[in-house]
Amino acid sequence: QEQFAQDGVPPAAAGVIAPLFTREIQHWAPQIVAWAAEFGLDPNMAATVMQIESCGDPNAVSSAGAQGLFQVMPFHFASGENMQDPETNARRGMAYLAQGMQLTGGDTGLSFAGYNGGHGTAAKGWGAWPSETQRYYTWATGIYKDAATGAGTSETLNQWLAAGGASLCQQAAARLGIQ
């Protein structure tokens, strides 16, 4: 009998990310698998966060000041750490995502919401979330469900790309030298 997580999504095959992620995310696949394993996370969950946050651009910076592959806020780093170093950024991002999984009893949706809006905000429920966190939850849970079930494509990912994600991915591809 197949094991399912609390939210009904089966765990990913060990050591891989789903083929539905964009080429910019696939570029980082071996590292994503290693980073996720270090924190006991499903690599598809980590890939989902990277997809939405930076589309694989290690030098991405948001208007709010979040930086790097996982768009981690500066206060999560120790003094002197390079926030855009992929290894450092991933470890800080994965630690925060793993904290969300612990706080929510393994609820991936609430963990995604917490990653975006803060774990305290996520605990307040949908109605108290900013619209950005509601959108993030919708994108992340849809993409992750498709990825975790082994789908080769994701309608939710396509919707995210059409809603502006494609420009983020074009920027990432240029930075990574992907044609």
Role assignments for model-derived ranges:
Residues 19-27, 36-44, 63, 67, ...:
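Soluble non-cytosolic domains of exported or imported proteins
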Residues 33, 37-38, 51-55, 74, ...:
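Sec-exported extracytoplasmic/periplasmic mature domains
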Residues 1-18, 156-179:
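An acidic, Gly/Ser/Thr/Pro-rich helix-cap/linker signature
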